[in-house]
Amino acid sequence: MPVVVVATLTAKPESRDAVRDICTRAIEQVHSEPGCQLYSLHESADTFVFVEQWSDTDALKTHSTAPAATALFRDVAEHLAAAPDVKVLTPVGAGDPAKGRLRS
């Protein structure tokens, strides 16, 4: 069963561009990781949100120690106003299945 992750990073106001650059550098490499079904970056002011979908928990575990994720969290740490907020989520089946969950 696919695993969905939402990771939120809050940049220091003066570090918004640095956080964006560090995050976008990781994306191409993460997209090539086994089991990556979705790895999408979104932003609003100083908040950056990754919406992720992995084929299974093993793929997510591999990603969490892969070079791209390791470098991202190492390089971004000094630019954040707070610790990253990472949530692993389970879909709630409701409504039209085609519209009520991420696609695998």
What would you call each of these model-derived segments?
Residues 4-10, 40-64:
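Short, well-ordered beta-strand segments in beta-rich or mixed alpha/beta enzyme
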Residues 10-20:
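Short, surface-exposed ligand-recognition loops at beta-strand->loop->(often short) alpha-helix junctions
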Residues 17-19, 60-62, 96-98:
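Short acidic, gly/pro-rich beta-turn/loop elements at beta-sheet edges
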Residues 28-37, 53-87:
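An amphipathic, aromatic/His-enriched active-site/gating alpha helix that lines ligand/cofactor pockets
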Residues 2, 40-46, 72-104:
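Glycine-rich beta-strand-turn "strand-cap" elements at beta-sheet edges
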Residues 11-13, 56, 90-92:
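Non-catalytic surface loops within mature trypsin-like serine protease
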Residues 3, 19-22, 65:
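Generic hydrophobic secondary-structure packing signal
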Residues 21-49:
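Short, glycine- and small/hydrophobic-rich beta-strand elements in well-ordered beta-sheets
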